[in-house]
């Protein structure tokens, strides 16, 4: 059982009888994970904290408390408290519902199964039951549930292939190797007899650092990162491994690089807070003005009117008392229902997202999931997208596609795999290139570190490099099949006959060399050959001189241009025949370099240089790193929508640049500004230089992108360099950040958020993306693949990257436009009604008397005008989905209609004008209170109820006026709300006064109002007269600043009416400019294949690749060197079962 940590290090006993209920088992972190925002203890304080970050909630709490002061409130004691409690309850239920969804997602991960050794037998348990010190078995293609110490594996020498793309984004597999003293424990019986003590460093977030000792029989052995298997990584090409659990749950390196789910609030919420602060000061000013008016009126009238003398010494007539009274009277200028209306609207908007059949993926049987609804509007304001590469943009599937040999360019781009029968035909017919065909296929089958495995009669290739595996499979498809590896030789089936090829030496691949070589003896006593594969830049300069090779390079270059235009990963193959004497002279020098301690790297490089020269070019290959479906088209559409896309990946620079081109993030004429320095001073100077270059390119209107690696980023994010980095990054059309740690991704996201002050969206599929997903304004996880960490930590989950286009362009644009209307409309209708109290105060001696019945004041928001903003937020379609998907430029025009101060001021101004119109027209209509044929009058409440009715009608018609598409729910809600008020007046005035005296003032009011023809005429005339202002303004805005919907409609009709529109636009240069921009953008955003590029563009692409290397994926920091791997593997040995 594990013991407690006796010092800063962690001490773990292995192999003793384990009692899961023992107290020591509780000293380490549980393996249960949680991404929930709340728990049973934190819900109330955290929920209240989140709610009272909204200033309107603080305001209404204060009003509810003030109303409890006796006689200070003209509207009653509970007219604010009751609605406020209802609103908080609705918000709490919504938060609980969404957090339950997160908990279910966590439980899905916690319930993954794993085999744990118990009493010498493998017992299947859940991930959450894994404890420190457990022995566990992981089978091929399974995820590691915790950080493990590798003890043994099914492979020779205790080796295991690990896929870490979920952690660092790298496509190549890592090779881990168990210590020799534990690698022999290949059965549960041996493992159950094993006993030792582990001492290792405490949990840390450094994924590339780990040290510890394991003590067996009194002898301590050191282990390190080469023996550590991280949670979230996946076992590949290895039947099984045994591991000892070192770190669990939130102590694991993966989760230490993640953050607790943050409390995110949208930009609109922040802006709404500022608007509420503004209205609060307006409210205070009105209260002070009204209290001052009261003081003036009292001073002028009380001394002259003997019947008012009792008010002279009344404490309730003080200025402060008046301020409080008017403050409460006008408090509804700030809409109490705004938050609950938004909560309801956002909740159902999230349901729309969840049920959008257009975002359903058949292959993974998964759909889009809105894990929070608070950020729906943020989807419509995105300016930056930070995307992971591996698994998000790419499938991490390599396909051998093309082959260049001499003047022949074999293969095509349409087939999924290499398919060209003419290759074999040319070889069999003795074509002039037949020798090269045979040699390049043999090189593809021999020059690598792949290990073959015969499983059920089928060859399976295990490789740390997916590129190498793709080449070996490609050779096998062309009848040169590699099937056996032994320490000193490989056996290949070459066109039906087995050939044994002796491996004499291996010169390892490194990123500096950009090549790998093997020296082979072709058959018993055959020729010695040097096979070298690598980047075109390093291969071409090592070829022998002569016209023949110059022609070969010319043909190869032409083919490489073709491959570059499709974003393929290219590799050149060359060879050289060696004499026995040449090899025997060189081999001792190379072996001496291998054994050297000092200057080993230089000695190895010098030895390689002596041999890798005067070679002949055999051919070149093209490998496709397959993108996810519709990735180039999606990125094109997003960029057409004025969104900047960044790629943040842990993969190599060359691979990242290659994918940036193939997914249309960078084009072939995009100038790459590469920052790859190792010191702060160099990084600072390079950034400063590139800022000047960027300014120059902007003037020339040329495209440019920045590429920066993780080491340079460490310096770029510190000190004065941070300013230059931010300046350069925000100027670039695209940015590629490679070799990044999870926390660096998060730091970049946070930097862009602060500097750009725009909405940043982060999207990824792996556990290494969790930190940046949580750091972004909006986090999107890919849910279609196994490993749910990213999806669980995200705000929105989608099955595939290309669904991001619909999520932003359709749901984002719609939700943003709808929510802005909901907020503005809520402010508008409240000011429209409650500012009437100010106008009435002028005619009521500034007494603080309300013109409306007290309970109808509270019910205005929660009942009579509750539905129009809801249907506006759910059913309004500002632009049809088909149009905005076809013309992404419309998305940017929605952002131009943001929640601006100007737009807010317009709505507030109209609300004040409407309230003036409604009050004074109503007052004028009933000025002498003679509204019946018999001369009876109705009193002040009659005036208030009539004005109330006209306000309800006006704000409902206003909702119809602001709606871009009249659907039946919108019409029913608006007309129905007017009818609801009429019905309420009838019921309230006839029934409630007889139930405990509720609403006694309203007794008989329905009969009084509805028996007057003046009321019915005014109900028809006054709202229409009031809304004439809006009709005039909307007409002017349609001409001067048309909406995105209007622009799209005009664009669709351009063939018949565009000339007429041009003439109309002559009255407004603003419209003309908008139309030109939109038209050019729409024409430029039609999605087509990004791979239709000109020859000159392809040439530029090749030039870039020759400057920056190639995209060959090979792990050069493996626990097992390539030479050692080749020398230690014997694929003919039988593997242990581990059972």
UniProtKB/Swiss-Prot annotation:
InterPro entries listed in its UniProt record: ATPase_P-typ_cyto_dom_N (IPR023299), ATPase_P-typ_P_site (IPR018303), ATPase_P-typ_TM_dom_sf (IPR023298), ATPase_P-typ_transduc_dom_A_sf (IPR008250), HAD-like_sf (IPR036412), HAD_sf (IPR023214), P-type_ATPase_IV (IPR006539), P-type_ATPase_N (IPR032631)
One family name in Pfam for this protein: PhoLip_ATPase_N
GO CC terms: apical plasma membrane; basolateral plasma membrane; cytoplasm; early endosome; early endosome membrane; Golgi apparatus; late endosome; plasma membrane
Keyword hit for Lyase: no
Enzyme Commission numbers on file: 7.6.2.1
UniProt keyword ATP-binding, yes or no: yes
Gene3D superfamilies, A to Z: Calcium-transporting ATPase, cytoplasmic domain N, Calcium-transporting ATPase, cytoplasmic transduction domain A, HAD superfamily/HAD-like
Domain of life: Eukaryota
Transmembrane segments: 78-98, 276-296, 318-338, 831-851, 855-875, 901-921, 935-955, 972-992, 1013-1033
Any single biological process term in GO: phospholipid transport
Localization, UniProt: Cell membrane; Early endosome membrane; Recycling endosome membrane
Molecular function terms from GO: ATP binding; ATP hydrolysis activity; ATPase-coupled intramembrane lipid transporter activity; magnesium ion binding; phosphatidylserine floppase activity
Keywords: ATP-binding, Cell membrane, Endosome, Magnesium, Membrane, Metal-binding, Nucleotide-binding, Translocase, Transmembrane, Transmembrane helix
Phenotypic effect of disruption: Results in abnormal formation of intestinal vacuoles.
Catalyzed reactions per annotation: ATP + H2O + phospholipidSide 1 = ADP + phosphate + phospholipidSide 2; a 1,2-diacyl-sn-glycero-3-phospho-L-serine(out) + ATP + H2O = a 1,2-diacyl-sn-glycero-3-phospho-L-serine(in) + ADP + phosphate + H(+)
Family membership: Belongs to the cation transport ATPase (P-type) (TC 3.A.3) family. Type IV subfamily.
Protein name: Phospholipid-transporting ATPase tat-1
Organism per entry: Caenorhabditis elegans
């Amino acid at each position: 059982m594990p013991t407690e940590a006796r010092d800063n290090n962690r001490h773990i006993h292995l192999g003793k009888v384990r009692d899961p209920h023992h107290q020591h088992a509780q000293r380490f972190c549980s393996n249960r994970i949680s991404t929930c925002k709340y728990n049973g203890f934190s819900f109330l304080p955290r929920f209240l904290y989140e709610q009272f970050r909204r200033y309107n909630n603080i305001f209404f709490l204060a009003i509810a408390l003030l109303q409890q002061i006796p006689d200070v409130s003209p509207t009653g004691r509970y007219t604010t408290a009751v609605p406020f409690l209802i609103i908080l309850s609705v918000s709490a239920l919504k938060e609980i519902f969404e957090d339950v969804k997160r908990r279910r997602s966590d439980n899905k991960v916690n319930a993954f199964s794993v085999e744990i050794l118990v009493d010498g037998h493998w017992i299947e348990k859940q991930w959450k039951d894994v404890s420190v010190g457990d022995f566990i078995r992981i089978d091929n293609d399974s995820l590691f549930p915790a950080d493990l110490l590798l003890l043994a594996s099914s492979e020779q020498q205790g080796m295991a292939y690990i896929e870490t793309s979920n952690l660092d984004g790298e496509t190549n597999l890592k090779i881990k190797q168990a210590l020799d003293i534990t690698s022999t424990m290949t059965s549960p019986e041996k493992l159950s007899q094993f006993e030792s003590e582990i001492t290792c460093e405490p949990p840390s977030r450094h994924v590339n650092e780990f040290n510890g000792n394991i003590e067996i029989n009194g002898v301590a052995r050191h282990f390190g990162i080469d023996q550590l298997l991280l949670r979230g990584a996946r076992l590949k090409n290895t039947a099984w491994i045994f591991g000892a659990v070192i770190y669990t749950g939130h102590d694991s390196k993966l989760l230490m690089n993640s953050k607790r789910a943050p409390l995110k609030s949208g930009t609109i919420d922040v802006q709404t807070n500022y608007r509420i602060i503004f209205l609060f000061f307006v409210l205070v000013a009105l209260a002070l003005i009204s209290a001052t008016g009261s003081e003036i009126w009292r001073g002028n009238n009380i001394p002259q009117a003997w019947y008012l003398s009792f008010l002279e010494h009344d404490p309730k007539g003080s200025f402060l008392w008046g301020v409080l009274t008017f403050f409460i009277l006008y408090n509804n200028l700030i809409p109490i229902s705004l938050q609950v209306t938004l909560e309801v609207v956002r909740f159902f908007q999230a349901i729309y997202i969840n049920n959008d059949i257009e975002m359903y993926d058949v292959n993974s049987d998964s759909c889009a999931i809105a894990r929070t609804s608070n950020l729906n509007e943020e989807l419509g304001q995105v300016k930056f997208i930070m995307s992971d590469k591996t698994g998000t943009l790419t499938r991490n599937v390599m396909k051998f596609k093309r082959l260049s040999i001499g003047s022949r360019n074999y293969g095509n781009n349409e087939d999924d795999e290499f398919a060209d029968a003419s290759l074999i035909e040319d070889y069999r017919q003795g074509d002039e290139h037949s020798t090269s065909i045979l040699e390049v296929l043999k090189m593809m089958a021999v020059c690598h570190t792949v290990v073959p495995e015969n499983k059920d009669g089928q060859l399976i290739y295990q490789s740390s490099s997916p590129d190498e595996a793709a080449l070996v499979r490609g050779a096998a498809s062309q009848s040169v099949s590699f099937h056996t590896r032994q320490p000193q030789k490989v056996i290949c089936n070459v066109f039906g006959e087995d050939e044994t090829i002796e491996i004499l030496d291996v010169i390892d691949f490194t990123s500096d060399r950009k090549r790998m070589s093997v020296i082979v003896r072709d058959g018993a006593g055959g020729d010695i050959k040097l096979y070298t594969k690598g980047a075109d830049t390093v291969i071409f300069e090592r070829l022998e001189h002569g016209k023949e090779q110059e022609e070969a390079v010319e043909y190869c270059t032409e083919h490489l241009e073709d491959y570059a235009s499709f974003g393929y990963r290219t590799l050149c193959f060359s060879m050289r025949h060696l004499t026995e004497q040449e090899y025997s002279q060189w081999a001792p020098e190379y072996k001496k370099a291998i054994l050297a301690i000092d200057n080993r790297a230089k000695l190895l490089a010098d030895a390689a240089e002596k041999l890798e020269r005067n070679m002949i070019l055999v051919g070149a290959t093209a490998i496709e790193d397959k993108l996810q479906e519709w990735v180039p088209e999606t990125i094109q559409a997003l960029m057409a929508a004025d969104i900047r896309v960044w790629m943040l990946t842990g993969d190599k620079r060359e691979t990242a640049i290659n994918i940036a081109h193939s997914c249309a993030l960078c084009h072939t004429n995009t100038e790459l500004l590469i920052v790859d320095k190792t010191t702060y001073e160099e990084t600072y100077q390079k950034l400063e230089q590139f800022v000047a270059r960027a300014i120059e390119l902007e003037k020339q209107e040329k495209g440019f992108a920045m590429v920066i690696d993780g080491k340079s980023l460490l310096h770029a994010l510190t000190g004065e360099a941070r300013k230059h980095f931010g300046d350069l990054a925000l100027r670039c059309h695209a940015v590629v950040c490679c070799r990044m740690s999870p926390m660096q991704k998060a730091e970049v996201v946070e930097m862009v958020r602060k500097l750009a002050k725009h909405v940043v969206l982060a999207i990824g599929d792996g556990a290494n993306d969790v930190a940046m997903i949580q750091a972004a304004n909006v986090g999107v996880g890919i849910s279609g693949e196994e490993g749910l960490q990213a999806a669980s930590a995200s705000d929105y989950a989608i099955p595939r990257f290309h669904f991001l286009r619909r999520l932003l362009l359709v749901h984002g644009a719609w939700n943003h436009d709808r929510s802005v209307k909901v907020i503005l409309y809520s402010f508008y209708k409240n000011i429209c009604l409650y500012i009437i109290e100010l106008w009435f105060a002028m005619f009521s001696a500034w007494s603080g008397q309300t013109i409306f019945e007290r309970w109808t004041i509270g019910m205005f928001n929660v009942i009579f005008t509750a539905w129009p903003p809801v249907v506006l937020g759910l059913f309004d379609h500002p632009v049809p989905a088909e149009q905005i998907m076809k013309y992404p430029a419309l998305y940017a025009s929605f952002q131009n209609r943001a929640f601006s101060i100007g737009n807010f001021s317009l709505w507030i101004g109209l609300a004040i004008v409407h309230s003036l119109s409604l009050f004074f027209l109503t007052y004028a209509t009933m000025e002498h209170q003679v509204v019946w044929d018999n001369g009876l009058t109705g009193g002040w409440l009659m005036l208030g109820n009539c004005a109330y009715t006209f306000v309800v009608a006006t704000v409902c018609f206003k909702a119809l006026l602001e709606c871009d598409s009249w659907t039946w729910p919108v019409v029913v809600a608006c007309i129905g709300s007017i009818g609801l008020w009429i019905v309420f007046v009838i019921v309230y005035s006839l029934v409630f006064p007889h139930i405990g005296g509720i609403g006694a003032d309203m007794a008989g009011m329905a009969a009084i109002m509805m028996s007057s023809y003046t009321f019915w005429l005014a109900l028809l005339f006054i709202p229409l007269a009031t809304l004439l202002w809006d009709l005039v303004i909307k007409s002017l805005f349609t001409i001067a600043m048309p909406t995105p919907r209007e622009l799209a409609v005009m664009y669709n009709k351009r063939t018949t009416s565009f000339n007429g529109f041009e003439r109309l636009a002559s009255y407004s240069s603003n419209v003309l400019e908008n139309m030109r921009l939109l038209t050019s953008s729409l024409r430029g955003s039609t999605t087509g294949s990004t791979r239709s590029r000109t020859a000159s563009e392809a040439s530029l692409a090749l030039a870039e690749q020759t400057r920056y290397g190639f995209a060959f994926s090979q792990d050069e920091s493996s626990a097992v060197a390539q030479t050692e791997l080749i020398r230690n593997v014997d694929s003919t040995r039988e593997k242990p079962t581990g059972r």
